[in-house]
C-alpha cells in the first residue's frame, strides 16, 4: 500500500519557489501595460480575423432572409379561389 503521511517518497531534483501573498501585487501593471498590449495585439490580427466573421455574418443573414421568403405563400396561386 502507500506510505504514511509523514513519510512520503522523496522527489529528487525538483525545486519549488514560493512568494508570500504579502509581497506580491494582485494586478501589477494591469492598466499601464496590459490594456495597451491587448489593443496592440488586436490591431495586429484584426485583418486576419475580421473578414471570415464578416463573411459568415453576411451569408447567415442572407440565408435567413431567403428562408423566410421561401416560407411565404405565392399570392398569385390563390387569385381564383373563392
From Swiss-Prot:
Pfam families (alphabetical): UcrQ
**Which ranges make up the Mitochondrial intermembrane topological domains here?**
69-82
Q: Which residues carry this modification: N6-succinyllysine?
A: 33
Purpose: Component of the ubiquinol-cytochrome c oxidoreductase, a multisubunit transmembrane complex that is part of the mitochondrial electron transport chain which drives oxidative phosphorylation.
Which family does the similarity line name?
A: Belongs to the UQCRQ/QCR8 family.
| Subunit comment | Component of the ubiquinol-cytochrome c oxidoreductase (cytochrome b-c1 complex, complex III, CIII), a multisubunit enzyme composed of 11 subunits. The complex is composed of 3 respiratory subunits cytochrome b, cytochrome c1 and Rieske protein UQCRFS1, 2 core protein subunits UQCRC1/QCR1 and UQCRC2/QCR2, and 6 low-molecular weight protein subunits UQCRH/QCR6, UQCRB/QCR7, UQCRQ/QCR8, UQCR10/QCR9, UQCR11/QCR10 and subunit 9, the cleavage product of Rieske protein UQCRFS1.
Q: What is this protein called?
A: Cytochrome b-c1 complex subunit 8
Q: What organism is this sequence from?
A: Bos taurus
**Taxonomy-wise, where does this protein's organism fall, top ranks first?**
Eukaryota, Metazoa, Chordata, Craniata, Vertebrata
Amino acid at each position: 500500500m502507500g506510505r504514511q503521511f509523514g513519510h512520503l517518497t522523496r522527489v529528487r531534483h525538483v525545486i519549488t519557489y514560493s512568494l508570500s501573498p504579502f509581497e506580491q501585487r494582485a494586478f501589477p501593471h494591469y492598466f499601464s501595460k496590459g490594456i495597451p498590449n491587448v489593443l496592440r495585439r488586436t490591431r495586429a490580427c484584426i485583418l486576419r480575423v475580421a473578414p471570415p466573421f464578416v463573411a459568415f455574418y453576411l451569408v447567415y443573414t442572407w440565408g435567413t432572409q431567403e428562408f423566410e421568403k421561401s416560407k411565404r405563400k405565392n399570392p398569385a396561386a390563390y387569385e381564383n379561389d373563392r
